[in-house]
Every structure is written in C-alpha cells, then in structure tokens.
Amino acid sequence: MRSHFCTEISEKDVGKTIKVAGWCNTYRDHGGVVFIDLRDKSGLVQLVCDPSSKAYEKALEVRSEFVLVAKGRVRLRGPGLENPKLKTGKIEIVLEELVIENKSATPPIEIGNKNVNEDLRLKYRYLDLRSLNAYEIFKLRSEVALITRNTLAQKGFLEIETPILSKTTPEGARDYLVPSRVHEGEFFALPQSPQLFKQLLMVGGMDRYFQIARCFRDEDLRADRQPEFTQIDAEMSFCDENDVMGVVEDLLQAIFKAVGHTISKPFKRMPYKEAMENYGSDKPDLRFELPLIEVGDCFRDSSNAIFSNIAKDPKNKRIKALNVKGADAVFSRSVLKELEEFVRQFGAQGLAYLQIKEDGIKGPLVKFLSEKGLKNILEKTGAQTGDIVFFGAGDKKIVLDYMGRLRLKVAETLDLIDKDALNFLWVVNFPMFEKTENGYHAAHHPFTMPKNIECEDIEEVEAHAYDVVLNGVELGGGSIRIHKEEMQKKVFEKINIHEEEAQKKFGFLLEALKFGAPPHGGFAIGFDRLIMLMTKSHSIRDVIAFPKTQKASCLLTDAPSPINEEQLRELHIRLRK
C-alpha cells in the first residue's frame, strides 16, 4: 500500500514516484493549490496538488484526520519555501493519485496539543496516541523491554510468568479482589507483585527468574502511581546484595545506552540514615548540593527554651540547618513568606532563618543565640556574606521530612538542578521495622532478611534491603530474602503476625521453606516510572497506553461500571442498598 514512510523521503528521492499513507495533519487551500501535511508514525511530509492534477477533486474533499494513501512525484520545494522545522522540509510530493481510505469526524482534541484538558485527552486516548511524541514514547518503551529481555537472558535468567489470580496477602496497599463463581463466597486477589511466587521459583531450583510483570494495587493515586502498573521483576539464587546490585547496574547501563547516555558503574551507595539526616529523604536528589546540617549543639545554651529543649533530646528531636548560598540577594520577604507557608504544609510550625549581611547577622533567631552559638553555626554551615541559613526544629521525622522538601523547593526556585544529569544512587541499610499505632510493621516487606534481628531496640534492626534512585526518584529496589522457616516466623512475630495468622496467610511459603530453600534475593524496577524519566514526561499516564485517571477510572471505556443482577447472582454477591 505504501513504498515509504513519510520521513524516509529526502532530496535523494527527487524525481522518483512514491506512495505514502497516513492521516491528514493539516489542510490548506492557497489560491486553488491544495497543501496537505500527511502524518504517519515517522513524522510529516507535505503533499501538493494543483487543479491540473487528476487527484485535485479528491484533494478538495480532504479534511483533518482523514486517512489517505497518496501517490506522487518527489520534488524540491521552491526557494524560500523550505521548512527547517521538518525533517522533510526541503521536499514535497506532487500528487498524482489520492485515495481517501476513511473519513473522520471533527476531532474533539487537537492531535499533539499537550495543553488540552487531560480528562478530554484520556477520553479520546486513541486520538491522543496519534501524536508523534506518543509514538516515540511507546517505541522507546518497546525497545527498553527488548533490551531488558536480552540483557537478563544473557545473564542466565529465565522469563517465567507467575499467576494473576492468586491469594490475598496484602503487602501494604489494598488488594483488588476477584470473586470466584465456582467457590462460593471466596475470592482471588490480583497480585501487588510476584514476590512470593518468585521466591517459590527459587525454592523450585529455577536459579534466575525474571518477567515484565503486571501488578495491581488499590491505593490512592498520585502523579507517579496507577492502580495497574508494570515492573521489571527478577530473583536470583545463591547471591548477596552485591550480586543483585551488579545485575541492576548492568541492566540500567544497557537501557540508558539505547538513548545515548553512558552510565558509569558502580553506583554510589548511601546508608539510609545518612540519606535521611543529610538530605531529608530516602531517595535524595544528588544533582545539586544543599545538604542538611545538624546544628543542635549550637542551641544547647539558647535563651529560647523550645530550641534548647529540642537540642537536649538528640534521639527523638532534630535541629537542621540549610545554608543557601547567595540567597539574600534573590529571596525577597515575600519569597521567604512563601517558603514558610510551604513547609507548614508538612508539619512545620514556622521557618526560622539567619541572613548573613555585610553589616552583621540578621533574622528572628539572632536574639536567642549567644555569640559563640552564632559562630558555631557559621562554622558548621560554611555560611558567608550573602547567604541565608534556614532552620527546622522539632520531632525528628517531621523535621527531616519538611527540611528535605525545602531543599528541593529551594533548588527548583534557584534553578540549581541540571535537568540533563543522570545521578544514580543506591540507598542501603534500611530499617527492617517501622513503628505504627498498632506496633511495628515491615518497612519493605516481611520476607526481607534482617541483619541484626536480636538487637534489643527493634527500631535499630536493619534490613538486607536496597533501593536504586535516579535524580531523586525511586526507580525500584529489592532485598535478600529470608530462606529459613525459623527466621521467617521470627519476623512475623515481630510484626504481630502470630502462628495461626501466619499459617492462614503464608502457610504455603512456610511449608516451602522447610524443603531446602536456597539463599536468594532480587529486585523490581518500576517500568512505567523508568520510561517516564527517560522521556522526561510529566506524568506516568503519558507512558501507559490506556491509563486510569487519578480517581482510578478509565474515561475511555467508563470502567469501572455496574454489572447486571444475573452476573451478581452467578458470583454469589448481593449489593447493599
């Protein structure tokens, strides 16, 4: 039906007769001469038709998004008529034959216009996908999937599919449940991850497994979350953290090479505690400096009782400083007020600061600090004339969180972030357990191997867990798993999953661990999130063919939708009025 894609045609084809096919991107009638920009997956080419052509009458019928097959002769555009914005901007096709394969209603959205309301774009997603940008995104997505398969296959991994219909074993989010028609009153769950099945594959001697897995989580949505998503999932037997990290680094190096980036290995490693204390995040963005600095000891003798009391409780409290170089010249009073309002959203009571000026140190904290205290702050933060030092004080968790967010906000405001940089990082030595209102739960998941389970302070128990971070975004992570039944039961006890509940939820895993499970570990990388970062897309919805909205609905198909009474009866379900 066609001899060329649109952008395959160039000056070397001048004089040739070719056939192209695609959609009418734009249509123009200039004094009787018809110009059509034809679009296919590769890009645009201009068709031109004057009244002397036998295709002229047909060309007059063409409108936006009509499906066309065109035959014509390639010629150079006239002097001054070239379009440098197009790959085919130096040539055009003089129409000889034109077939309208299909007409189109007036499109409700402009193809390729990102300023169109997102809900409208999602409702007509099949039109939104016609944009050249969308094609490039899904072309890259396909290439990355192929690179993943080839890279892991070369390393001895087998691609094995795990069940979609499984048992409900909540991993932190709510499960999507599927009622069984055959087993009345019982339900399958869609997997939040293949975690337990891939561990069972290791017990089964598969040695190295991977799949590009579909996962489902019924959780509140954000810009980077979807109820169904894809991850690169893998597991290895007879390995330690270094082995797993090495595979991940090799894989990411191969993936980013496809888009022209050279990644150096090994990636930097940072303990969780260091990440939190110095950057206020377990996924720090290291494309810029601005570390958080502990200055609690500078406030021990402060005349402000609030600060001095905080300084005397270093286990549970923090006083953190953030020195912003040269900020005094660019941060007006209104900007300082905006920053204060920003951190208040995340639990801050306010935002104290010191301005280092030519004529001395100014700011609301000055009167509460001794000369020695001020001197110590300047030494610790390296503050100089023209800088502003911001302070956060209070409960450790809250302070680290809002000061970490402030760090990012300041970097964005001052344009300190190199948008083209790729900064990979491993965050390691995560806490094994986190405190909740009802005791403790597993920080990652309860199948992670703890490092020091006998530690008296449960909050000091660390996990053999690791996250890979790119530019402040968690790409994925993993852990070394528990491979002995006794240890697994011990971890369950720590998080108040006692014997009866453990057998009910995870009896099949505990049983499997009795039969010589090998040491094993693995990882999962968020595939959608990876593509989002590689394409610099604003939302994860841009890199999923048919995404859900932030309300977990599909505007295209109107899913979820009610079902009829007969279907409900077959599933033994009665809805409450």
UniProtKB/Swiss-Prot annotation:
UniProt-annotated binding residues for ATP: 217-219, 226, 474, 526-529
Give the GO cellular component terms, alphabetically: cytoplasm
Q: Where does L-aspartate bind?
A: 171, 217, 444, 481
The protein's enzyme class: ligase
Catalytic reaction annotation: tRNA(Asx) + L-aspartate + ATP = L-aspartyl-tRNA(Asx) + AMP + diphosphate
Q: Where in the cell is it found?
A: Cytoplasm
Which Gene3D superfamilies does its entry note? Bira Bifunctional Protein, Domain 2 (3.30.930.10), GAD-like domain (3.30.1360.30), Nucleic acid-binding proteins (2.40.50.140)
Q: Which HAMAP family match?
A: Asp_tRNA_synth_type1 (MF_00044)
Could you tell me what this protein is called?
A: Aspartate--tRNA(Asp/Asn) ligase
Species of origin: Helicobacter pylori (strain HPAG1)
